Amino acid sequence: MKLYPRTSSGLFSLQSLLKSGFSPTLNSIDRFLRYLYRLQKFNCILQFYSQLDSKQININHRIYSIVSWAFLNLNRYEDAEKFINIHISKASIFPRTHMLDSLIHGFSITRDDPSKGLLILRDCLRNHGAFPSSLTFCSLIYRFVEKGEMDNAIEVLEMMTNKNVNYPFDNFVCSAVISGFCKIGKPELALGFFESAVDSGVLVPNLVTYTTLVSALCQLGKVDEVRDLVRRLEDEGFEFDCVFYSNWIHGYFKGGALVDALMQDREMVEKGMNRDVVSYSILIDGLSKEGNVEEALGLLGKMIKEGVEPNLITYTAIIRGLCKMGKLEEAFVLFNRILSVGIEVDEFLYVTLIDGICRKGNLNRAFSMLGDMEQRGIQPSILTYNTVINGLCMAGRVSEADEVSKGVVGDVITYSTLLDSYIKVQNIDAVLEIRRRFLEAKIPMDLVMCNILLKAFLLMGAYGEADALYRAMPEMDLTPDTATYATMIKGYCKTGQIEEALEMFNELRKSSVSAAVCYNRIIDALCKKGMLDTATEVLIELWEKGLYLDIHTSRTLLHSIHANGGDKGILGLVYGLEQLNSDVCLGMLNDAILLLCKRGSFEAAIEVYMIMRRKGLTVTFPSTILKTLVDNLRSLDAYLLVVNAGETTLSSMDVIDYTIIINGLCKEGFLVKALNLCSFAKSRGVTLNTITYNSLINGLCQQGCLVEALRLFDSLENIGLVPSEVTYGILIDNLCKEGLFLDAEKLLDSMVSKGLVPNIIIYNSIVDGYCKLGQTEDAMRVVSRKMMGRVTPDAFTVSSMIKGYCKKGDMEEALSVFTEFKDKNISADFFGFLFLIKGFCTKGRMEEARGLLREMLVSESVVKLINRVDAELAESESIRGFLVELCEQGRVPQAIKILDEISSTIYPSGKNLGSYQRLQFLNDVNEEEIKKKDYVHDFHSLHSTVSSLCTSGKLEQANEFVMSVLSCMPR
């Protein structure tokens, strides 16, 4: 007997029967609902059940199951959950488990809400005693791993393996968990999980698991452990495939081990494995990220040649590398190639290009790319808009970025980018507005946003709000990181709130965060507050924790201690550090030596050096330290430091360092020490160069050892060194000073014959030497024959010739030389003019002297020199103006006296260009004073006068005269 026809109209007639009060049997209802289920009339099932429920007709567990499945098949998971929770006890074990599997799967997969699936799973285990299948547990784990929610993934895994459920998990689950930890940047947890799984005996790893394990080890930088693992697996008979090698190579790239990655790729190819599109893409991506885009492009060509078709990931990797290097046009060429071969582009590729465009500052082109995206049917997501917003902010167009953000539904990155940009320009009003919008959007705060908000509060001086936000971080499931503590400490230190900064620093010390930047910042702040003892304690703690001391912080502390306690303060610090591991404070101790040397505290510097030697530390002598000692006429101390230093110290010294000391020793007259240091350097394997020997030759000449200097010069070629222009210049100059002009000219000719080009200084040495002795004909011969065609005479050459003729009293020739070279645009210098003016004045030819004086005062080089003296004196009246006035008044002798004063001011010792003394002549020129000062720079006149007085028995007058002259010498 049939209770219902097999037509849709029959269905409605049965429903009509129910409405009329007819009560079918449970068996009939069951058969009817199963019939509807086979027809997938799920809505009809639910409508029919609603009528049954309204009639309060009792139904059995099979009917409850059919209704539950109807809800599930209609994806009405919330209704299904509610229905199942009410009636689950009426279902048999198998259908109940199957329904829960489907319900959890529906939320986790279809709705992409694995967290809801986890809630149902917890409820199942806690309240219903129902265990979903192992497949459900595994699918939940996979979903959480994909989302990076590893805490939830591990919770599901623990439920799966507890004693009540006791489902085994396989290598695919294990590899998924390991991969998940690596993706979130916690490879150490991946390694720990693997070791626990193996140690517990629940897992026998296969190649799949080992493949993901290699990634974790590479990320941790444990390259040697990877090699050991591979060797062990080879011994156990594992055969590696392309996937294993690709993962291994990818791990090396992520760990920054480029060379190791390329070596493994070569090994893979040598073992006969052909690269596929994945392995090629990994190589290309790794090379592009390292900046080797040209090599990546070469690989792209190779893979195409081998018949391996690049995919979108391959092309995107290269385009990202090109954009990173600023090669936008090349990136767009590749982009157009992608389009031409018919590969469908995605949003990420556009984001990559837009980011590259923004970095170049071409924002108009970036907006054009947005339009191009939409034309291709790619709807820009917040990822794209965040890229544009970031580009606008980088270009300083923060207001425009703000406007763009108002047209999209922003995320935490949107608001953190805007907030950080407004903080940088210190726009407080905009900061407050962005914060308001962020709070209104009710977006969960991440750690980056929290740190930016802290920075904003501190910028505004809202220290209470900053502290409140910091205290609220645990409630938001946020853990302070290095940036958090650094931001808070910096904010407090900036306004001098050292107590609050120290309190925050103590919070850092209690945490697991180990931030060198915070230690450095607090040390710097303590130094500024003068709390040097506390700063030293923090320094010691920093080193004990193995943290890095910033060089700026180190030097700030040293300078502060020296400013407060002088040399004793530095020595106190150094002795206080003796308890520490020697190597950690090496840099600071070397800096202490440098500081003490710069301050002229050489004894203290040597004491620090001796402490370092006792501790077996490597003392570095950078050129700055050695040069400081030499510049302070402490070459002998530098010499002693070097010869008494250990092997490790000397290994850092090169020929430049030795030459600096040798040059200083020669200048200070320690020739024997200089020669000893040469031998010492050679014994340490340092090859001395021509510059070193130039210092020695010059030192010998200065000590009157010209013969020895020439012998050393002759020996240079024997030791494989070629004398330079400087070498010849030193010897020629000193030969001329000794009056050995023929030897000087022979050396000059020898120099030219060897292909060296004498400079003007060398020629001037010979010319000036001849002129000093009045041998003007020889001087002119050198100028006309030897110089011409090789080098152009300069102002010094002209002035030397003028001086020579003036000494002979031949003013006509002196004037002729002046005029001849003037016509060639070579003017005399200050002294050339002075010699001429004095010469004509002595001859009584005052008008000619006056004309030359007038010409002198418009000479560019002379005016510059006089102005330099003016600047040094800072007098209200211009010296040049005063001289012009004297010239116009015809007072040439008085002008000469002032010019002599200028000469003695510029060259007070006759040769030192760097010392100056104050002029006292602008008003009443004291004739007697000038006369006495003339003696200062004329030793022969001084000696002659003193000798004459002594010979005639006028010792008292001689003594008074000497004291008078000494009083005029520069102090």
Curated annotation (Swiss-Prot):
Transmembrane stretches, start-end: none
Gene3D superfamilies in the cross-refs: Tetratricopeptide repeat domain (1.25.40.10)
Family designation: Belongs to the PPR family. P subfamily.
Protein name as it appears in the record: Pentatricopeptide repeat-containing protein At5g57250, mitochondrial
Principal location listed in the UniProt entry: mitochondrion
PPR repeats: 101-136, 137-173, 174-208, 211-245, 247-281, 282-316, 317-351, 352-386, 387-421, 422-445, 452-486, 487-521, 522-556, 557-590, 591-625, 626-660, 695-729, 730-764, 765-799, 800-834, 835-869, 870-904
Lineage summary: Eukaryota, Viridiplantae, Streptophyta, Embryophyta, Tracheophyta
PANTHER family: MITOCHONDRIAL GROUP I INTRON SPLICING FACTOR CCM1-RELATED, PENTATRICOPEPTIDE REPEAT-CONTAINING PROTEIN PET309, MITOCHONDRIAL
Pfam families: PPR, PPR_1, PPR_2, PPR_3
Gene Ontology CC annotation, any one: mitochondrion
Transit peptide extent on chain: 1-64
